[in-house]
Swiss-Prot record:
Keywords: Aminopeptidase, Hydrolase, Manganese, Metal-binding, Metalloprotease, Protease. Catalyzes the removal of a penultimate prolyl residue from the N-termini of peptides. The gene is AMPP. GO terms for molecular function: metal ion binding; metalloaminopeptidase activity. Mn(2+) 2 binds at residues 413, 424, 536. This is Probable Xaa-Pro aminopeptidase P. CDD domains: APP (cd01085). It catalyses: Release of any N-terminal amino acid, including proline, that is linked to proline, even from a dipeptide or tripeptide.
């Protein structure tokens, strides 16, 4: 991982701050749609700090600079940040939060500036209150200062064509989705909903794009009222097929006109659906993740209500067509991974081929690309050998990566976008003789993964409540991992999808798991400078039958759809109970049954799969 000298960039930024009377400037990770993964043109935090992880916030004062990120990226950030930066490790008790650190830089009258399009309205309010306690104030700086530093070198905003996502894969027409949304808005007496999250726009209209790497979304907004549906998108993105798909049911408007229209809507919030002058004015809804800019355009708290996005909740519950697509694409994807692992072992062990991490991941993409309905990868493949596996979101760089060591742990976290679903699988392997410590760590992680997979729980249970099931075996040894146990997964959409998840984030305590949720199950363990272990399956929530039904309420469990063998060499059977051994053997039997047919004429892969799926 390369370290970028940020001295000149920071010096220029501070000049711009001084010109605008800004004492501290914030640079969030997100774009104006609050996307986790962003287009290159929106990589402002990476540009100013040199840190390339997907999560974090940069804070720059006139004399100091700090970068806050979570446990997934502590190792990476410590390597990528130069001497200008202080690393704030989020979640570590001895360290201040980035909000607290920002407040510490203030004295009476000092100003904290931020681009209001890159922060949510609720975060802006919370930050403003924190800053006020230190005598400072928060200022929305309309012109992004990092963009000015970046100048002509900043990449252009993508303008890729949008495609129709057919009902045969979506399972529901966009007209039905809009009708359902309107019913929800009417229940809550809303004047309409302004859609700002890119995956929500794509899902609602059954459209897909290519503006953000690995995420089939496109830059857009939408406004849905009881009688209108407006899609804000650049004209050049639209093909004749897309226009025909939308027909006369959707009005197409320029992407940049959203704020002008939002302002007009805010000024006429006494909407047509009021039903009479005696009724209170109806407010427009925006997501709690919508930007401060959008909230201000609509008129702020008097005209706008921030709510849990009804689209996000609906999108997280997959319909039968989407669930069947997830099953099917994971079988094909599992076959691709199996072929890759068999090939990789043969190259490293039998042929003694010298391969680096990128060469290996290139081969995996080549194999995947031949699968039915393949569109592209769902994220940048993590192909990591030895100590690199301890970097949770490691990114092997083509000109600066490691040779794969057959005598070390190899961790591969990868996924693909298929027309019928999105995949995300992690497997940790060893092509030589693993140490006792590596086998123990792997087995403890595996026990945690099985505990989630086999969990049965009453309806209303959250992923927050389930998280300890995955960690319990590591905890008994005084071990842990600094990332979530699971995240929601889209259906040919973002591989990280809210609002569900398994972990300690507050949002995971607010959303009960429901039938139709698709989520990852991925505990891990990492030793910096030595090795990393992670095992990940995708699971789907379903209703299960129990002997009793306390409280006369439904009980839920999971169905796993990932079909890729575990690494038998890393499993220590002495640490497993009979139920866990039974689960592993039944899982491997299922993997063999569902994927071996792909290798009828591929003796190498078939033999590898047969060996890896033998009973333990």
């Amino acid at each position: 991982m390369e370290t970028v000298d940020t001295s000149q960039r920071l010096a220029r930024l501070r000049e711009l701050m001084k010109e605008r009377n800004v004492d501290v400037y914030l640079v969030p990770s997100e774009d104006s749609h609050q996307s986790e993964y962003i287009a290159p043109c929106d990589g402002r935090r990476e540009f100013i700090s040199g840190f390339s992880g997907s999560a974090g916030c940069a804070i720059v004062s006139m004399t100091k600079a700090a970068l806050s990120t979570d446990g997934r990226y502590f190792n990476q950030a410590s390597k990528q940040l130069d001497n200008n930066w202080l690393l704030l490790k989020r979640g570590i008790e001895s360290m201040p939060t980035w909000q607290e650190w920002t407040a510490e830089q203030l004295e009476g009258g000092k100003v904290v500036g931020v681009d209001p399009s890159l922060i949510t309205a609720s975060d802006a309010r919370s930050l403003s209150e924190t800053i006020k306690k230190s005598g400072g104030s928060l200022l929305g700086v309309q012109e992004n200062l990092v963009d000015l530093v970046w100048g002509k070198d900043r990449p252009c905003r993508p303008s890729e064509k949008v495609t129709v996502h057919p009902v045969e894969f979506a399972g529901k027409s966009f007209e039905e989705k809009i009708t359902d949304l309107r019913k929800e808005l009417e229940k809550k007496k809303s004047a309409g909903f302004v859609v700002s999250m890119l995956d929500e726009v794509a899902w609602l209209f059954n459209l897909r794009g290519n503006d953000i790497p690995y995420n089939p979304v496109f830059f857009s907004y939408a406004i849905i009222t009881p009688s209108t549906a407006d899609l804000y998108i650049d004209e050049e993105k639209l093909s004749a097929d897309v226009k025909k798909h939308l027909g006369d049911k959707v009005s197409l408007k320029p992407y940049t006109s959203i704020f002008e229209d939002a302002k007009a809507l805010g000024q006429s919030a006494q909407a047509e659906v009021n039903g009479g002058a005696s009724d209170p004015p109806r407010k427009f809804f925006i997501s709690t993740k919508a930007s401060w800019s959008l909230s201000l355009a609509l008129g702020g708290a008097n005209k706008v209500e921030e709510v849990r996005s009804p689209i996000s909740d609906a999108k997280a519950i997959k319909n039968d067509t989407e669930l069947e697509g997830m099953r099917a694409c994971h079988i094909r994807d599992g076959a691709a991974l199996t072929k890759y692992f068999a090939w990789l072992e043969n190259e490293l062990v039998n042929k003694k081929t010298v391969l680096n991490e990128v060469e290996a991941s290139d081969k995996l993409e080549e194999i995947r690309s031949k699968q039915k309905n393949f569109v592209g990868l769902s994220f940048d493949t993590i192909s990591s050998s030895g100590p690199n596996a301890a970097v949770v979101h490691y990114k092997a760089e083509r000109k600066n990566c490691s040779i794969i060591d057959p005598e070390a742990v190899y961790l591969c976290d990868s996924g693909a976008q298929y027309l019928d679903g999105t995949t995300d699988t992690t497997r940790t392997l060893h092509f030589g003789e693993p140490t006792e410590k590596e086998r123990k760590a792997y087995t403890l992680v595996l026990k945690g993964m099985i505990a989630i997979d086999t969990a049965i729980f009453p309806k209303g249970t959250t992923g927050f409540s389930l998280d300890t099931l995955a960690r319990q075996f590591l905890w008994k040894e005084g071990l842990d991992y600094l990332h979530g146990t699971g995240h929601g997964v889209g259906s040919y959409l973002n591989v990280h999808e809210g609002p569900i998840g398994i972990g300690t984030r507050v949002q995971y305590s607010e959303t009960p798991l429901s039938v139709g949720n698709v989520i990852s199950d991925e505990p891990g363990y990492y030793e910096d400078g030595k090795f990393g272990i992670r095992i990940e399956n995708i699971i789907m929530a379903r209703e299960v039958k129990t002997t009793f039904s306390f409280g006369e309420r439904p009980w839920l469990g999971f169905e796993h759809v990932t079909m890729t063998p575990l690494c038998r060499k890393l499993i220590d059977p002495s640490l497993l109970n009979d139920a866990e051994k039974k689960w592993i053997n039944e899982y491997h039997s299922e993997v063999w049954e569902k994927t071996s047919g792909y290798f009828a004429e591929d003796e190498l892969t078939r033999n590898w799969l047969k060996r890896e799926t033998q009973p333990i």
